[in-house]
């Protein structure tokens, strides 16, 4: 039961950090390439 409580306390922290990183990445990409439907380095 203690391990389950540890899991419940770690999962929100990891999800918050990963979502914070993702939002920061998207904000910076929109700052450097505003209104881009496709990014230049993703084109093949």
Curated annotation (Swiss-Prot):
InterPro entries tied to this protein: PSI_PsaJ (IPR002615), PSI_PsaJ_sf (IPR036062)
Chief location category: plastid
Pfam families to which the protein is assigned, alphabetical: PSI_PsaJ (PF01701)
Domain of life: Eukaryota
GO cellular component: photosystem I; plastid membrane; thylakoid membrane
Annotated keywords: Membrane, Photosynthesis, Photosystem I, Plastid, Transmembrane, Transmembrane helix
Subcellular location: Plastid membrane
Any one GO biological process: photosynthesis
Keyword Oxidoreductase found: no
Membrane topology per record: Single-pass membrane protein
Bilayer-crossing regions: 7-27
Family annotation (Gene3D superfamilies): Single helix bin
Family indicated by similarity: Belongs to the PsaJ family.
Summary of the function given for this chain in its UniProt record: May help in the organization of the PsaE and PsaF subunits.
HAMAP family linked to this entry: PSI_PsaJ
Full protein name: Photosystem I reaction center subunit IX
Gene name for this UniProt entry: psaJ
């Amino acid at each position: 039961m203690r391990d389950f409580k540890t899991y419940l306390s770690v999962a929100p922290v990891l999800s918050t950090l990963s979502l914070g990183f993702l939002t920061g990445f998207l904000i910076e990409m929109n700052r450097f390439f505003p209104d881009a439907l496709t990014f230049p380095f993703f084109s093949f």
